[in-house]
Amino acid sequence: EKNMRILLIVTLMLSFTAYAQEESSREFADGVIELTTVKVKTNFLQDYLDGIEKTWVAAAKIQKEMGIISDYNVYIGNDGSTVYLTTAYPSWANKAPWSEEQTAEFQEKFRKTISQEDNVELSQSYEDIREIVSVELIGRLVFK
């Protein structure tokens, strides 16, 4: 009986030691990235990029200054008609709805870059030249 106890204790100790030494070779990085895939009609890429520079990029710059996002990027696919928009949030909490103060601050700053009428007009013109294919939240893996 005593030998069985010793054997059981040794077995448990070895299994805990082996389990404690196991370490994952990868982990998720902090934050989350919103990836939007946009298909732009042929010959309208420049028009689309000109438009988002005044709207989406301007808004992203303000959000970055406010600390809501940590980065943003625009990528063009090799087909010349697919655009990838990325918005990096430093944490999932930053993806949450904005407070009234944040909304007011953003609107005040954004109105200095483009009028409400111009923003609506540009945004509506996108409907004719692009299709949003997908919006995904993706995480970045870090390999150790």
Cite the ranges covered by each PLM segment.
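Positively charged n-region of N-terminal signal peptides that target proteins for export
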Residues: E1-L7, Q21
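Sec-dependent N-terminal signal peptides
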Residues: I6-S15
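Immediate post-signal-peptide N-terminus of mature secreted/exported proteins
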Residues: Q21-L45
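Short, glycine- and small/hydrophobic-rich beta-strand elements in well-ordered beta-sheets
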Residues: E22-S24, A60-Y84, P97
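Solvent-exposed, acidic/flexible segments
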Residues: A29, K41, L45-L49, E53, ...
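Solvent-exposed loop/turn segments at secondary-structure junctions
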Residues: N43, I76-T82, P90-N94, E105
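Short amphipathic alpha-helical segments
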Residues: F44-I69
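An amphipathic, aromatic/His-enriched active-site/gating alpha helix that lines ligand/cofactor pockets
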Residues: I62-S70, A88-E136
